[in-house]
């Protein structure tokens, strides 16, 4: 099955979402949504007065055309990937349908 759109999900260190979005826009992305998150997968287990501390993260969601996805993900990885302060990882998921997005030819 061919999908016209993909959801690119990026998980990165808090405060570096501008690096991700700058790279994504340069590769053709129109925009994205940034959410604040806490990482819970690590084994750090640090506590402060019995309260568990988790790494602060940002998550960026970008809806992209399927034929632009690889270039956007490559740009994110090169400019904000694991070897940078942003420490971003990204993956994509197919989107079966969308509503409310501007079409390519609408500019």
Where are these regions (language model features)?
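Positively charged, small/polar-rich N-terminal and surface patches that mediate targeting and assembly
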Residues: 1-107
